[in-house]
């Protein structure tokens, strides 16, 4: 048993310490073997041997705890030395990159602000008028349904799009107006391409009637999409939105397959990226504007980020998996 103490004294790390412990105190260790020998003894000889085993076992356990404490302190000191940072040296610490959503937001803002668009920020909590009625969304519109919108008890709601910011801006300012707004929006969806909270960016331009035409809208959108995606092809399609008339949706040539056809573009070669149109007169009437015209556009920031970062699952943006976030 003195050999166990001698082995313990020579231990230099946690691995060796564990090996000595198992050899001494394990189910097949030295002390277990000694206790098994008691069954072959009898009388006073058995009691004396048992007392001796307990004495040595207690001595070993005490020495083991002391050695364990010393080893842990030594290993901690060595680890701290390795992890020590010399603040006088050049900063070689790896810094994180911008989150894909922040990168996308900043890139959008960098395009529009030099063109004279003012960035407006609005409240996340809205009322029915600013979120629905002023935007020509009738009472029977499915977007008003409890299954699609988060409502509060006082008839307030979490905005379902950033369009209410446009309404507030028109109420607080007079034409000419040139603004963009971006931020969080909320809807009752959660799957590969939808999350309960997502980000939108919208733009609005309003001036005296006749000063703003669809050609102005088309020019801005085409310049932006070529700036953001590079040399992609564009396709305009007529569409319907209650708050714009006429309305259009814009597609870009698939950035994944170069229009050869893939699962992402449903083998069509095209990807939808935004909606736009000339502001419906019903919206201007709700605000109290007269003799004005304007255009508006809107797009999902996650949608743009998914295309540029080639991400298939929208939920990846909101999960804290560093392996995913560090890959961008």
From Swiss-Prot:
Keywords: Aminoacyl-tRNA synthetase, ATP-binding, Cytoplasm, Ligase, Magnesium, Metal-binding, Nucleotide-binding, Protein biosynthesis
EC number: 6.1.1.20
Cofactor(s) recorded in Swiss-Prot or TrEMBL: Mg(2+)
Signal peptide: none
One GO molecular-function entry: ATP binding
Cofactor remark from the record: Binds 2 magnesium ions per tetramer.
GO cellular component: cytoplasm
Keyword Iron-sulfur: no
Main location: cytoplasm
Keyword Nucleotide-binding part of the UniProt annotation: yes
A single BP term in Gene Ontology: phenylalanyl-tRNA aminoacylation
Location in or out of the cell: Cytoplasm
Family: Belongs to the class-II aminoacyl-tRNA synthetase family. Phe-tRNA synthetase alpha subunit type 1 subfamily.
Protein name listed in UniProt: Phenylalanine--tRNA ligase alpha subunit
Gene: pheS
């Amino acid at each position: 048993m003195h050999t166990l103490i001698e082995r313990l004294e020579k231990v230099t790390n946690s691995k060796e310490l564990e090996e000595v412990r198992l050899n001494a105190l394990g189910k097949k260790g030295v002390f277990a073997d000694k206790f098994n020998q008691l069954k072959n003894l009898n009388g006073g000889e058995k009691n004396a041997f048992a007392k001796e085993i307990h004495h040595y076992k207690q001595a070993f356990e005490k020495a083991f705890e002391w050695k364990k404490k010393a080893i842990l302190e030594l290993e901690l000191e060595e680890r701290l030395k390795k992890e020590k940072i010399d603040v006088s040296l050049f900063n070689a610490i790896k810094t994180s990159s911008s989150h894909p959503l922040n990168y996308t937001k900043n890139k959008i803002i960098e395009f529009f602000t030099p063109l004279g668009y003012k960035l407006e920020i609005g409240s996340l909590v809205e009322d029915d008028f600013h979120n629905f009625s002023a935007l020509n969304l009738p009472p029977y519109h499915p977007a008003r349904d409890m299954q699609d919108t988060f409502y509060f008890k006082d008839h307030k709601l979490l905005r379902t799009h950033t369009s209410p910011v446009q309404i507030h801006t028109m109420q607080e300012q007079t034409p000419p107006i040139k603004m963009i707004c971006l931020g969080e929006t909320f809807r009752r969806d959660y799957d590969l391409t939808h999350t309960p909270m997502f980000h939108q960016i919208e733009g609005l331009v309003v001036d005296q009637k006749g000063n703003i035409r669809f050609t102005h809208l088309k020019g801005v959108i085409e310049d932006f999409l070529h700036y953001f995606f590079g040399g992609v092809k564009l396709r305009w399609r007529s569409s319907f939105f209650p708050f714009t008339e006429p309305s259009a949706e814009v597609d870009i040539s698939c950035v994944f397959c170069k229009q050869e056809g893939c699962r992402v573009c449903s083998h069509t070669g095209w990807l939808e990226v935004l909606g736009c149109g000339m502001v419906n007169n019903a919206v201007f009437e709700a605000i109290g504007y007269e003799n004005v015209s304007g255009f508006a556009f809107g797009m999902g920031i996650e949608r743009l980020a998914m295309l540029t970062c080639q991400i298939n699952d929208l939920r990846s943006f909101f999960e804290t998996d560093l392996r995913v976030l560090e890959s961008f």
